[in-house]
Amino acid sequence: MQTKETNGEKDRFDFYAYLDRMKFIRRWPLMRCTRDENIMEHSQCVALITHALCAIKNTLYGGHADEGKAVLYAVYHETSEVMTGDLPTPVKYYNRGIQGEYKSLEKLACEKLVATLPAELRESVAPYVFADENSEEYKIMKAADRFAAYVKCLEELRGGNAEFLKAKASIEADLHSRKMPEVEYFFEKFIPAYELTLDELESL
């Protein structure tokens, strides 16, 4: 009697088990943090803010961003790190040579990761793991990625951790430099609430 294994078919696929390990990959590895953050919770934060930015752009500024595509870009944007780990930003962007090599490593990790899916499912997932970096949705997701880092800075500063002062200023300048009206709207309407306590939020 032939089994799937003897037919050359796999019984086990590791893709989602790999992604579940995102909760073990710590962000900000060179920084002292009052609370550790992993790439799984970071990706959730990026997905929420990505959806918000798309809604703002489409509703208030006449945009036509594909919200579903943008949010799925956010969900998968850190998945390569289950194989590479989180390389500190100062190292990743130290020079163009290192940046280029790391991009190649990320691409290889993504290819290996997608290969752990059944062949018939890869076409449904791969477009979000390998995001179109020239698309409007990708640009929105990258802004949301920066917002998620900015929110982390606010959290650390509220906890008395001055280690994040420079990062906060740098990220804020980067976000404003993008000249995206949806980014400015999010800054004005939503960011102030991130600095409130729970009691203050409930009293609004």
Residue positions per predicted region:
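Alpha-helical, largely C-terminal catalytic domains
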Residues: 1-204
